[in-house]
Protein backbone atom coordinates (compact mmCIF):
# COMPACT_ATOMS: atom_id res chain seq x y z
CA UNK A 1 0.00 0.00 0.00
CA UNK A 2 1.47 3.34 -1.07
CA UNK A 3 1.90 6.29 1.28
CA UNK A 4 -0.73 8.35 -0.58
CA UNK A 5 -3.25 5.51 -0.31
CA UNK A 6 -2.63 5.24 3.43
CA UNK A 7 -3.12 9.00 3.81
CA UNK A 8 -6.35 8.78 1.80
CA UNK A 9 -7.68 6.13 4.17
CA UNK A 10 -6.64 8.09 7.24
CA UNK A 11 -8.41 11.21 5.97
CA UNK A 12 -11.42 9.14 4.94
CA UNK A 13 -11.92 7.53 8.36
CA UNK A 14 -11.02 10.72 10.22
CA UNK A 15 -13.63 12.63 8.23
CA UNK A 16 -16.27 9.96 8.85
CA UNK A 17 -15.55 10.01 12.58
CA UNK A 18 -15.89 13.80 12.72
CA UNK A 19 -19.16 13.74 10.76
CA UNK A 20 -20.53 10.88 12.88
CA UNK A 21 -19.66 12.84 16.05
CA UNK A 22 -21.30 15.99 14.69
CA UNK A 23 -24.48 14.15 13.67
CA UNK A 24 -24.70 12.37 17.01
CA UNK A 25 -23.93 15.45 19.11
CA UNK A 26 -25.87 18.18 17.35
CA UNK A 27 -28.74 16.29 15.72
CA UNK A 28 -29.57 12.95 17.32
CA UNK A 29 -28.84 13.87 20.94
CA UNK A 30 -30.91 17.10 20.76
CA UNK A 31 -33.80 15.18 19.22
CA UNK A 32 -33.65 12.58 22.00
CA UNK A 33 -33.33 15.36 24.58
CA UNK A 34 -36.45 17.04 23.21
CA UNK A 35 -38.37 13.75 23.33
CA UNK A 36 -37.19 13.10 26.87
CA UNK A 37 -38.19 16.61 27.97
CA UNK A 38 -41.61 16.17 26.35
CA UNK A 39 -42.35 12.71 27.77
CA UNK A 40 -40.46 12.43 31.07
CA UNK A 41 -39.81 14.52 34.17
CA UNK A 42 -37.45 13.48 36.96
CA UNK A 43 -37.14 10.01 35.45
CA UNK A 44 -40.85 9.19 35.29
CA UNK A 45 -43.43 9.50 32.55
CA UNK A 46 -45.02 12.94 32.80
CA UNK A 47 -46.45 13.46 29.34
CA UNK A 48 -50.06 13.28 30.50
CA UNK A 49 -49.42 15.80 33.27
CA UNK A 50 -47.92 18.21 30.73
CA UNK A 51 -50.85 17.63 28.37
CA UNK A 52 -53.24 18.37 31.23
CA UNK A 53 -51.39 21.59 32.07
CA UNK A 54 -51.45 22.67 28.44
CA UNK A 55 -55.17 21.90 28.18
CA UNK A 56 -55.91 23.97 31.29
CA UNK A 57 -54.04 27.00 29.94
CA UNK A 58 -56.44 29.54 28.45
CA UNK A 59 -53.65 31.09 26.34
CA UNK A 60 -52.69 27.71 24.88
CA UNK A 61 -56.32 26.90 24.06
CA UNK A 62 -56.74 30.28 22.40
CA UNK A 63 -53.51 29.81 20.44
CA UNK A 64 -54.66 26.34 19.34
CA UNK A 65 -58.00 27.69 18.10
CA UNK A 66 -56.25 30.61 16.37
CA UNK A 67 -53.85 28.20 14.67
CA UNK A 68 -56.64 25.91 13.47
CA UNK A 69 -58.90 28.56 11.98
CA UNK A 70 -56.03 30.70 10.66
CA UNK A 71 -54.54 27.66 8.91
CA UNK A 72 -57.90 26.81 7.31
CA UNK A 73 -58.58 30.42 6.29
CA UNK A 74 -55.06 30.87 4.92
CA UNK A 75 -55.29 27.68 2.87
CA UNK A 76 -58.57 28.88 1.34
CA UNK A 77 -57.45 32.44 0.54
CA UNK A 78 -54.01 31.42 -0.74
CA UNK A 79 -55.57 28.77 -2.99
CA UNK A 80 -57.98 31.32 -4.49
CA UNK A 81 -55.29 33.96 -5.07
CA UNK A 82 -52.67 31.45 -6.23
CA UNK A 83 -54.93 29.74 -8.76
CA UNK A 84 -56.09 33.11 -10.07
CA UNK A 85 -52.44 34.09 -10.60
CA UNK A 86 -51.70 30.87 -12.46
CA UNK A 87 -54.77 31.34 -14.67
CA UNK A 88 -53.70 34.90 -15.50
CA UNK A 89 -50.10 33.92 -16.28
CA UNK A 90 -50.59 30.53 -17.97
CA UNK A 91 -54.13 30.28 -19.34
CA UNK A 92 -55.71 33.64 -20.16
CA UNK A 93 -54.20 36.38 -22.32
CA UNK A 94 -53.92 39.45 -20.07
CA UNK A 95 -52.08 42.66 -21.04
CA UNK A 96 -48.73 43.19 -19.31
CA UNK A 97 -48.13 39.53 -18.56
CA UNK A 98 -44.38 40.10 -18.07
CA UNK A 99 -45.00 42.83 -15.50
CA UNK A 100 -47.54 40.67 -13.68
CA UNK A 101 -45.06 37.79 -13.59
CA UNK A 102 -42.48 40.02 -11.88
CA UNK A 103 -45.07 41.29 -9.39
CA UNK A 104 -46.38 37.82 -8.52
CA UNK A 105 -42.82 36.52 -8.03
CA UNK A 106 -41.99 38.99 -5.23
CA UNK A 107 -42.64 36.42 -2.43
CA UNK A 108 -39.49 34.66 -3.66
CA UNK A 109 -37.37 37.59 -2.44
CA UNK A 110 -39.82 39.10 0.04
CA UNK A 111 -40.84 36.43 2.51
CA UNK A 112 -40.57 35.34 6.13
CA UNK A 113 -39.61 37.92 8.72
CA UNK A 114 -38.59 40.36 5.97
CA UNK A 115 -42.12 40.39 4.56
CA UNK A 116 -43.77 40.50 7.98
CA UNK A 117 -41.72 43.57 8.89
CA UNK A 118 -42.45 45.06 5.46
CA UNK A 119 -46.20 44.63 5.81
CA UNK A 120 -46.06 46.11 9.30
CA UNK A 121 -44.21 49.13 7.92
CA UNK A 122 -46.69 49.50 5.06
CA UNK A 123 -49.97 48.90 6.89
CA UNK A 124 -49.02 49.01 10.60
CA UNK A 125 -49.34 51.91 13.07
CA UNK A 126 -46.42 53.81 11.50
CA UNK A 127 -47.08 52.60 7.96
CA UNK A 128 -47.30 54.76 4.88
CA UNK A 129 -50.72 53.37 3.91
CA UNK A 130 -51.97 53.96 7.44
CA UNK A 131 -50.77 57.57 7.23
CA UNK A 132 -52.67 58.02 3.96
CA UNK A 133 -55.84 56.42 5.35
CA UNK A 134 -55.60 58.49 8.55
CA UNK A 135 -55.55 61.65 6.44
CA UNK A 136 -58.76 60.53 4.73
CA UNK A 137 -60.41 59.00 7.80
CA UNK A 138 -59.16 60.74 10.96
CA UNK A 139 -61.12 58.39 13.24
CA UNK A 140 -59.35 55.30 11.88
CA UNK A 141 -57.30 53.59 14.63
CA UNK A 142 -53.58 53.52 13.87
CA UNK A 143 -53.46 49.80 14.68
CA UNK A 144 -56.32 48.86 12.34
CA UNK A 145 -54.12 46.31 10.56
CA UNK A 146 -52.70 44.65 13.69
CA UNK A 147 -54.36 41.39 14.77
CA UNK A 148 -55.84 38.42 12.97
CA UNK A 149 -56.66 40.45 9.85
CA UNK A 150 -53.04 41.51 9.33
CA UNK A 151 -51.80 37.94 9.78
CA UNK A 152 -54.36 36.55 7.32
CA UNK A 153 -53.65 39.33 4.82
CA UNK A 154 -49.89 38.69 5.00
CA UNK A 155 -50.37 34.92 4.72
CA UNK A 156 -52.63 35.31 1.69
CA UNK A 157 -50.17 37.31 -0.37
CA UNK A 158 -46.90 35.81 0.85
CA UNK A 159 -47.62 32.08 0.56
CA UNK A 160 -48.42 31.95 -3.16
CA UNK A 161 -44.84 31.07 -4.13
CA UNK A 162 -45.75 27.36 -4.26
CA UNK A 163 -48.48 28.12 -6.80
CA UNK A 164 -46.17 30.43 -8.75
CA UNK A 165 -43.48 27.76 -9.06
CA UNK A 166 -45.20 24.37 -9.04
CA UNK A 167 -48.72 24.98 -10.33
CA UNK A 168 -47.47 27.03 -13.29
CA UNK A 169 -45.21 24.11 -14.22
CA UNK A 170 -48.19 21.74 -13.98
CA UNK A 171 -50.26 23.99 -16.27
CA UNK A 172 -47.55 23.78 -18.91
CA UNK A 173 -47.95 20.00 -18.94
CA UNK A 174 -51.60 20.22 -20.02
CA UNK A 175 -52.01 18.96 -23.59
CA UNK A 176 -53.53 21.83 -25.55
CA UNK A 177 -54.96 19.45 -28.14
CA UNK A 178 -57.41 18.12 -25.52
CA UNK A 179 -58.57 21.69 -24.85
CA UNK A 180 -59.04 22.28 -28.58
CA UNK A 181 -60.98 19.02 -28.89
CA UNK A 182 -63.31 20.01 -26.05
CA UNK A 183 -63.75 23.48 -27.52
CA UNK A 184 -64.61 22.04 -30.94
CA UNK A 185 -67.34 19.99 -29.26
CA UNK A 186 -68.94 23.18 -27.93
CA UNK A 187 -67.67 23.06 -24.35
CA UNK A 188 -67.68 26.38 -22.51
CA UNK A 189 -64.53 27.88 -20.97
CA UNK A 190 -65.61 26.93 -17.44
CA UNK A 191 -66.40 23.38 -18.55
CA UNK A 192 -62.95 23.06 -20.14
CA UNK A 193 -61.25 24.33 -16.99
CA UNK A 194 -63.29 22.01 -14.77
CA UNK A 195 -63.32 18.84 -16.87
CA UNK A 196 -60.10 19.02 -18.94
CA UNK A 197 -57.52 21.18 -17.19
CA UNK A 198 -58.33 20.54 -13.53
CA UNK A 199 -57.99 16.71 -13.62
CA UNK A 200 -54.45 17.07 -14.99
CA UNK A 201 -53.28 19.61 -12.44
CA UNK A 202 -55.34 18.29 -9.49
CA UNK A 203 -52.52 16.24 -7.86
CA UNK A 204 -50.27 19.30 -7.98
CA UNK A 205 -53.08 21.48 -6.61
CA UNK A 206 -53.48 19.09 -3.68
CA UNK A 207 -49.73 18.97 -3.04
CA UNK A 208 -49.44 22.76 -3.17
CA UNK A 209 -52.47 23.13 -0.89
CA UNK A 210 -50.87 20.82 1.66
CA UNK A 211 -47.60 22.74 1.46
CA UNK A 212 -49.55 25.94 2.11
CA UNK A 213 -51.30 24.31 5.05
CA UNK A 214 -47.95 23.19 6.48
CA UNK A 215 -46.47 26.67 6.14
CA UNK A 216 -49.52 28.35 7.66
CA UNK A 217 -49.64 25.98 10.62
CA UNK A 218 -45.99 26.64 11.47
CA UNK A 219 -46.26 30.38 10.87
CA UNK A 220 -44.08 32.31 13.30
CA UNK A 221 -42.91 35.70 12.02
CA UNK A 222 -46.29 36.99 10.78
CA UNK A 223 -48.20 36.48 14.05
CA UNK A 224 -45.20 37.65 16.06
CA UNK A 225 -44.96 40.94 14.16
CA UNK A 226 -48.55 41.51 13.02
CA UNK A 227 -50.63 39.62 15.58
CA UNK A 228 -50.33 42.22 18.30
CA UNK A 229 -51.07 41.49 21.95
CA UNK A 230 -54.30 39.55 21.43
CA UNK A 231 -53.60 37.16 18.54
CA UNK A 232 -51.14 34.31 19.13
CA UNK A 233 -50.49 31.01 17.38
CA UNK A 234 -48.99 27.77 18.69
CA UNK A 235 -45.52 28.50 17.34
CA UNK A 236 -45.38 31.60 19.54
CA UNK A 237 -46.56 29.61 22.56
CA UNK A 238 -43.60 27.25 22.18
CA UNK A 239 -41.25 30.23 22.41
CA UNK A 240 -43.21 31.68 25.35
CA UNK A 241 -43.16 28.40 27.28
CA UNK A 242 -39.44 28.03 26.68
CA UNK A 243 -38.81 31.59 27.93
CA UNK A 244 -40.85 30.73 31.07
CA UNK A 245 -38.41 27.88 31.77
CA UNK A 246 -40.92 25.17 30.93
CA UNK A 247 -38.92 23.21 28.34
CA UNK A 248 -41.06 20.13 29.02
CA UNK A 249 -44.25 21.85 27.90
CA UNK A 250 -42.45 23.66 25.06
CA UNK A 251 -40.97 20.38 23.81
CA UNK A 252 -44.31 18.56 24.07
CA UNK A 253 -46.16 21.29 22.19
CA UNK A 254 -43.44 21.36 19.51
CA UNK A 255 -43.54 17.55 19.31
CA UNK A 256 -47.31 17.47 18.82
CA UNK A 257 -47.07 20.13 16.12
CA UNK A 258 -44.19 18.21 14.55
CA UNK A 259 -46.20 14.99 14.32
CA UNK A 260 -49.04 16.80 12.55
CA UNK A 261 -46.64 18.58 10.20
CA UNK A 262 -44.77 15.36 9.38
CA UNK A 263 -48.04 13.68 8.46
CA UNK A 264 -48.91 16.57 6.18
CA UNK A 265 -45.43 16.47 4.61
CA UNK A 266 -45.85 12.78 3.78
CA UNK A 267 -49.25 13.52 2.24
CA UNK A 268 -47.82 16.37 0.15
CA UNK A 269 -45.00 14.13 -1.11
CA UNK A 270 -47.56 11.50 -2.10
CA UNK A 271 -49.61 13.98 -4.11
CA UNK A 272 -46.45 15.53 -5.57
CA UNK A 273 -45.29 12.13 -6.82
CA UNK A 274 -48.76 11.36 -8.14
CA UNK A 275 -48.80 14.69 -9.93
CA UNK A 276 -45.44 13.99 -11.58
CA UNK A 277 -46.71 10.56 -12.70
CA UNK A 278 -50.13 11.72 -13.87
CA UNK A 279 -48.86 14.61 -15.95
CA UNK A 280 -45.55 13.09 -16.92
CA UNK A 281 -45.15 13.16 -20.70
CA UNK A 282 -48.70 13.76 -21.85
CA UNK A 283 -48.31 17.27 -23.24
CA UNK A 284 -47.68 16.98 -26.98
CA UNK A 285 -48.99 20.47 -27.78
CA UNK A 286 -47.99 23.33 -25.51
CA UNK A 287 -50.89 25.21 -23.98
CA UNK A 288 -51.71 28.50 -25.70
CA UNK A 289 -53.01 31.60 -23.96
CA UNK A 290 -56.75 32.06 -24.35
CA UNK A 291 -58.29 35.48 -25.01
CA UNK A 292 -61.21 36.41 -22.75
CA UNK A 293 -64.03 37.17 -25.19
CA UNK A 294 -66.54 38.67 -22.76
CA UNK A 295 -65.60 42.39 -22.43
CA UNK A 296 -66.86 42.70 -18.86
CA UNK A 297 -65.04 39.53 -17.75
CA UNK A 298 -61.87 40.74 -19.47
CA UNK A 299 -62.02 44.09 -17.63
CA UNK A 300 -62.70 42.41 -14.27
CA UNK A 301 -59.89 39.85 -14.65
CA UNK A 302 -57.40 42.50 -15.79
CA UNK A 303 -58.37 44.86 -12.97
CA UNK A 304 -58.05 42.12 -10.35
CA UNK A 305 -54.67 41.07 -11.75
CA UNK A 306 -53.28 44.59 -11.52
CA UNK A 307 -54.80 45.10 -8.07
CA UNK A 308 -52.93 42.01 -6.89
CA UNK A 309 -49.76 43.30 -8.55
CA UNK A 310 -50.12 46.58 -6.65
CA UNK A 311 -50.59 44.73 -3.35
CA UNK A 312 -47.45 42.68 -4.01
CA UNK A 313 -45.25 45.56 -5.16
CA UNK A 314 -46.37 48.33 -2.80
CA UNK A 315 -44.59 47.08 0.37
CA UNK A 316 -41.38 46.40 -1.56
CA UNK A 317 -41.39 49.82 -3.22
CA UNK A 318 -42.19 51.69 0.00
CA UNK A 319 -39.51 49.85 1.97
CA UNK A 320 -36.83 50.67 -0.59
CA UNK A 321 -37.95 54.31 -0.85
CA UNK A 322 -38.16 54.92 2.90
CA UNK A 323 -34.83 53.18 3.52
CA UNK A 324 -33.35 56.26 1.79
CA UNK A 325 -35.63 58.72 3.64
CA UNK A 326 -34.93 60.64 6.85
CA UNK A 327 -36.14 58.78 9.94
CA UNK A 328 -38.37 61.73 10.84
CA UNK A 329 -40.57 61.08 7.79
CA UNK A 330 -41.43 57.50 8.82
CA UNK A 331 -45.01 57.25 10.03
CA UNK A 332 -45.80 60.78 8.90
CA UNK A 333 -45.22 61.05 5.14
CA UNK A 334 -47.07 58.87 2.65
CA UNK A 335 -44.08 59.21 0.32
CA UNK A 336 -40.65 60.55 1.33
CA UNK A 337 -40.13 64.21 0.50
CA UNK A 338 -36.33 63.95 0.61
CA UNK A 339 -33.69 61.26 0.41
CA UNK A 340 -30.50 60.55 2.32
CA UNK A 341 -27.85 57.86 2.73
CA UNK A 342 -27.68 58.44 6.49
CA UNK A 343 -29.59 55.24 7.30
CA UNK A 344 -27.19 53.13 5.24
CA UNK A 345 -24.24 54.96 6.80
CA UNK A 346 -25.53 54.02 10.26
CA UNK A 347 -25.84 50.35 9.33
CA UNK A 348 -22.61 50.00 7.36
CA UNK A 349 -20.54 52.53 9.31
CA UNK A 350 -19.47 50.21 12.11
CA UNK A 351 -21.69 51.50 14.94
CA UNK A 352 -24.33 49.74 17.04
CA UNK A 353 -26.61 49.30 14.01
CA UNK A 354 -23.82 47.43 12.23
CA UNK A 355 -23.56 44.73 14.93
CA UNK A 356 -26.64 42.62 13.94
CA UNK A 357 -25.65 42.88 10.28
CA UNK A 358 -22.11 41.76 11.09
CA UNK A 359 -23.34 38.96 13.37
CA UNK A 360 -25.64 37.54 10.71
CA UNK A 361 -23.03 37.84 7.98
CA UNK A 362 -20.43 36.09 10.15
CA UNK A 363 -22.68 33.34 11.50
CA UNK A 364 -24.23 32.67 8.08
CA UNK A 365 -20.76 32.49 6.51
CA UNK A 366 -19.56 30.07 9.19
CA UNK A 367 -22.67 27.91 8.83
CA UNK A 368 -22.47 27.81 5.03
CA UNK A 369 -18.73 27.03 5.06
CA UNK A 370 -19.10 24.21 7.61
CA UNK A 371 -22.22 22.83 5.92
CA UNK A 372 -20.54 22.90 2.52
CA UNK A 373 -17.44 21.16 3.89
CA UNK A 374 -19.58 18.41 5.42
CA UNK A 375 -21.59 18.06 2.23
CA UNK A 376 -18.60 17.95 -0.12
CA UNK A 377 -17.01 15.25 2.02
CA UNK A 378 -20.07 13.13 2.77
CA UNK A 379 -22.08 13.26 -0.47
CA UNK A 380 -19.43 11.64 -2.75
CA UNK A 381 -19.15 8.81 -0.23
CA UNK A 382 -22.94 8.46 -0.04
CA UNK A 383 -23.17 8.37 -3.84
CA UNK A 384 -20.34 5.86 -4.37
CA UNK A 385 -20.88 3.51 -1.45
CA UNK A 386 -24.26 2.19 -0.39
CA UNK A 387 -24.00 0.53 3.02
CA UNK A 388 -25.62 0.87 6.42
CA UNK A 389 -23.36 3.79 7.36
CA UNK A 390 -24.09 5.90 4.29
CA UNK A 391 -27.80 5.07 4.46
CA UNK A 392 -27.82 6.17 8.08
CA UNK A 393 -26.08 9.42 7.17
CA UNK A 394 -28.58 9.98 4.38
CA UNK A 395 -31.50 9.65 6.79
CA UNK A 396 -29.84 11.89 9.38
CA UNK A 397 -29.19 14.63 6.84
CA UNK A 398 -32.88 14.65 5.86
CA UNK A 399 -34.16 14.80 9.45
CA UNK A 400 -33.90 18.61 9.85
CA UNK A 401 -36.15 18.93 6.81
CA UNK A 402 -38.83 16.73 8.37
CA UNK A 403 -38.51 17.88 11.98
CA UNK A 404 -40.02 21.31 12.68
CA UNK A 405 -37.51 24.07 13.36
CA UNK A 406 -39.05 24.75 16.77
CA UNK A 407 -38.54 21.14 17.90
CA UNK A 408 -34.92 21.25 16.71
CA UNK A 409 -34.36 24.52 18.61
CA UNK A 410 -35.94 23.21 21.82
CA UNK A 411 -33.82 20.06 21.52
CA UNK A 412 -30.61 22.08 21.24
CA UNK A 413 -31.62 24.17 24.27
CA UNK A 414 -32.43 21.13 26.42
CA UNK A 415 -29.33 19.18 25.32
CA UNK A 416 -26.83 21.96 25.99
CA UNK A 417 -28.24 23.85 28.98
CA UNK A 418 -25.91 21.83 31.22
CA UNK A 419 -22.35 20.47 30.84
CA UNK A 420 -22.37 17.91 28.03
CA UNK A 421 -19.50 15.39 27.73
CA UNK A 422 -19.88 15.26 23.93
CA UNK A 423 -18.61 18.87 23.75
CA UNK A 424 -16.00 18.69 26.50
CA UNK A 425 -18.47 19.34 29.34
CA UNK A 426 -19.18 22.83 28.01
CA UNK A 427 -22.52 24.60 28.42
CA UNK A 428 -23.39 25.88 24.95
CA UNK A 429 -26.68 27.52 25.89
CA UNK A 430 -26.01 31.22 26.22
CA UNK A 431 -22.77 30.97 24.26
CA UNK A 432 -22.05 32.47 20.86
CA UNK A 433 -21.87 29.10 19.10
CA UNK A 434 -25.25 27.48 19.66
CA UNK A 435 -26.98 29.61 17.02
CA UNK A 436 -24.34 28.97 14.29
CA UNK A 437 -24.57 25.26 15.11
CA UNK A 438 -28.34 25.44 14.63
CA UNK A 439 -27.78 27.25 11.33
CA UNK A 440 -25.49 24.44 10.13
CA UNK A 441 -28.06 21.75 10.99
CA UNK A 442 -30.81 23.79 9.33
CA UNK A 443 -28.69 24.16 6.16
CA UNK A 444 -27.67 20.54 5.61
CA UNK A 445 -30.82 19.05 3.99
CA UNK A 446 -30.93 21.49 1.06
CA UNK A 447 -27.17 21.33 0.56
CA UNK A 448 -27.16 17.53 0.55
CA UNK A 449 -30.11 17.35 -1.85
CA UNK A 450 -28.62 19.70 -4.45
CA UNK A 451 -25.04 18.44 -4.17
CA UNK A 452 -26.20 14.83 -4.44
CA UNK A 453 -27.85 15.68 -7.76
CA UNK A 454 -24.66 17.41 -8.90
CA UNK A 455 -22.42 14.45 -8.00
CA UNK A 456 -24.79 11.91 -9.56
CA UNK A 457 -24.71 13.94 -12.79
CA UNK A 458 -20.91 13.64 -13.14
CA UNK A 459 -19.76 11.32 -15.90
CA UNK A 460 -17.81 8.47 -14.19
CA UNK A 461 -15.39 8.46 -17.13
CA UNK A 462 -13.71 11.62 -15.81
CA UNK A 463 -12.85 10.03 -12.47
CA UNK A 464 -11.84 6.74 -14.10
CA UNK A 465 -9.49 8.52 -16.50
CA UNK A 466 -7.82 10.41 -13.64
CA UNK A 467 -7.54 7.20 -11.62
CA UNK A 468 -5.96 5.40 -14.60
CA UNK A 469 -3.32 8.14 -14.77
CA UNK A 470 -2.39 7.51 -11.14
CA UNK A 471 -4.12 10.49 -9.51
CA UNK A 472 -4.83 10.10 -5.80
CA UNK A 473 -8.30 10.46 -4.31
CA UNK A 474 -7.80 13.97 -2.88
CA UNK A 475 -6.17 15.10 -6.14
CA UNK A 476 -9.09 13.73 -8.20
CA UNK A 477 -11.54 15.43 -5.88
CA UNK A 478 -9.69 18.75 -6.06
CA UNK A 479 -8.84 18.86 -9.78
CA UNK A 480 -11.60 16.79 -11.42
CA UNK A 481 -14.73 16.56 -9.29
CA UNK A 482 -14.88 19.94 -7.54
CA UNK A 483 -14.61 22.03 -10.74
CA UNK A 484 -17.59 20.09 -12.14
CA UNK A 485 -19.81 20.67 -9.10
CA UNK A 486 -18.54 24.19 -8.33
CA UNK A 487 -21.48 26.02 -10.03
CA UNK A 488 -23.99 24.04 -7.96
CA UNK A 489 -21.93 24.53 -4.80
CA UNK A 490 -21.78 28.29 -5.38
CA UNK A 491 -25.53 28.47 -5.97
CA UNK A 492 -26.37 26.34 -2.92
CA UNK A 493 -24.01 28.38 -0.75
CA UNK A 494 -25.66 31.60 -1.94
CA UNK A 495 -29.17 30.26 -1.38
CA UNK A 496 -28.44 29.09 2.15
CA UNK A 497 -26.51 32.25 3.02
CA UNK A 498 -29.52 34.28 1.96
CA UNK A 499 -31.96 32.01 3.84
CA UNK A 500 -29.92 32.23 7.03
CA UNK A 501 -29.82 36.02 6.93
CA UNK A 502 -33.62 35.98 7.36
CA UNK A 503 -34.01 32.81 9.48
CA UNK A 504 -36.27 33.98 12.29
CA UNK A 505 -37.70 30.97 14.21
CA UNK A 506 -34.32 29.36 14.95
CA UNK A 507 -32.78 32.75 15.75
CA UNK A 508 -35.60 33.65 18.16
CA UNK A 509 -34.95 30.51 20.21
CA UNK A 510 -31.14 30.39 20.19
CA UNK A 511 -29.77 33.93 20.03
CA UNK A 512 -28.36 35.87 22.99
CA UNK A 513 -26.96 39.35 23.57
CA UNK A 514 -23.58 38.29 22.17
CA UNK A 515 -24.84 37.29 18.72
CA UNK A 516 -28.09 39.17 18.06
CA UNK A 517 -28.80 38.50 14.35
CA UNK A 518 -30.59 40.48 11.66
CA UNK A 519 -34.04 38.81 11.98
CA UNK A 520 -34.29 39.75 15.65
CA UNK A 521 -33.16 43.31 14.92
CA UNK A 522 -35.71 43.55 12.09
CA UNK A 523 -38.56 42.46 14.37
CA UNK A 524 -37.41 44.85 17.10
CA UNK A 525 -37.41 47.68 14.59
CA UNK A 526 -40.77 46.67 13.14
CA UNK A 527 -42.57 46.82 16.49
CA UNK A 528 -40.64 49.81 17.84
CA UNK A 529 -42.11 53.31 18.05
CA UNK A 530 -38.64 54.81 17.57
CA UNK A 531 -38.37 56.09 13.95
CA UNK A 532 -34.56 55.77 14.00
CA UNK A 533 -34.82 52.08 14.83
CA UNK A 534 -37.52 51.63 12.18
CA UNK A 535 -35.29 53.32 9.58
CA UNK A 536 -32.42 50.97 10.39
CA UNK A 537 -34.81 48.00 10.11
CA UNK A 538 -35.81 49.16 6.62
CA UNK A 539 -32.14 49.15 5.59
CA UNK A 540 -31.77 45.60 6.92
CA UNK A 541 -34.82 44.48 4.92
CA UNK A 542 -33.58 46.17 1.74
CA UNK A 543 -30.15 44.54 2.03
CA UNK A 544 -31.69 41.09 2.50
CA UNK A 545 -33.95 41.60 -0.52
CA UNK A 546 -30.90 42.65 -2.55
CA UNK A 547 -29.10 39.44 -1.54
CA UNK A 548 -32.18 37.39 -2.47
CA UNK A 549 -32.42 39.03 -5.88
CA UNK A 550 -28.72 38.43 -6.51
CA UNK A 551 -29.13 34.73 -5.71
CA UNK A 552 -32.07 34.41 -8.11
CA UNK A 553 -30.12 36.15 -10.88
CA UNK A 554 -27.18 33.79 -10.30
CA UNK A 555 -29.58 30.85 -10.43
CA UNK A 556 -30.97 32.09 -13.74
CA UNK A 557 -27.44 32.50 -15.05
CA UNK A 558 -26.52 28.97 -14.07
CA UNK A 559 -29.85 27.66 -15.45
CA UNK A 560 -30.58 25.77 -12.27
CA UNK A 561 -33.81 27.40 -11.16
CA UNK A 562 -34.69 27.95 -7.54
CA UNK A 563 -36.41 25.71 -4.99
CA UNK A 564 -38.51 27.43 -2.31
CA UNK A 565 -38.31 26.87 1.64
CA UNK A 566 -40.68 27.36 4.36
CA UNK A 567 -41.28 31.00 4.52
CA UNK A 568 -41.41 30.76 8.16
CA UNK A 569 -44.15 33.14 8.15
Curated annotation (Swiss-Prot):
- ABC transmembrane type-1 domain: residues covered: 64-268, 357-551
Under the heading Pfam families, the entry gives: BPD_transp_1
Its keywords, alphabetically, are: Cell inner membrane, Cell membrane, Membrane, Plasmid, Repeat, Transmembrane, Transmembrane helix, Transport
Q: Which InterPro entries match?
A: MetI-like, MetI-like_sf
> Among its keywords, does the record have Transmembrane?
yes
Regions that span the bilayer: 10-30, 68-88, 98-118, 121-141, 145-165, 196-216, 247-267, 304-324, 363-383, 395-415, 426-446, 480-500, 534-554
Q: What is the annotated localization of this protein?
A: Cell inner membrane
Q: How does it sit in the membrane?
A: Multi-pass membrane protein
GO BP annotation list = transmembrane transport
Q: Can you tell me which family this protein belongs to?
A: Belongs to the binding-protein-dependent transport system permease family. CysTW subfamily.
Q: What does this protein do?
A: Probably part of the binding-protein-dependent transport system y4fNOP. Probably responsible for the translocation of the substrate across the membrane.
Name of the protein described by the UniProt record: Probable ABC transporter permease protein y4fN
Which organism is this protein's natural source? Sinorhizobium fredii (strain NBRC 101917 / NGR234)
Q: What is the lineage of its organism?
A: Bacteria, Pseudomonadati, Pseudomonadota, Alphaproteobacteria, Hyphomicrobiales
